[in-house]
Amino acid sequence: MAHPLLDAIEMARFVRSCKPMLKGLMAFLSLTFAPCPDEAPQIGVAEAHIWQVDLDKPHKNYLSASEQERAHAMRHPEKQAHYVAARSALRLILSKYTQLAPQDHDISFGPYGKPQINGSDLHFNVTHAQGKALIGMARVPVGIDLEFPRAVTQLDRLIADYFSAEEARELMALHDEEKAKAFL
């Protein structure tokens, strides 16, 4: 399936290790991305695929009517364009797993507002910021967030308030620059 948006999409695989990170609540990953594979990716139960999308590259609009309405309601043209690109990329990526056309996916929202594909055991989550998007795919519920490095004020207080005693000790032992990077 040749498509210009595929030039803006890369994929990385993450296989959950036996040792949970941060008590199994979160995993902070440094991933190496590769060009979008041509073949349909297979995803195991203990595996997550992370897709990275450049939202400023050309794309085709695959949005549903409700997604189109949401996009048109956005006041900022750049945010609107990034939303359209992220949702279109999501639909294109879903097609690699389901063999459906991008516009044929029946996406709804669960009881807590999380998007889901009706009639599928495939789970996904989307986040975007600063012209980039990450899309997480798994056979179990998955969440993903994209954060860019920024200055953090009152770092020591945040570490003390939100991390376990052991995690706080490990973070506090780092130099300020390393501590901020590890925190984020």
Predicted regions located by residue number:
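Core catalytic alpha/beta fold that binds nucleotide/phospho-ligands
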Residues: 9, 14-18, 22-184
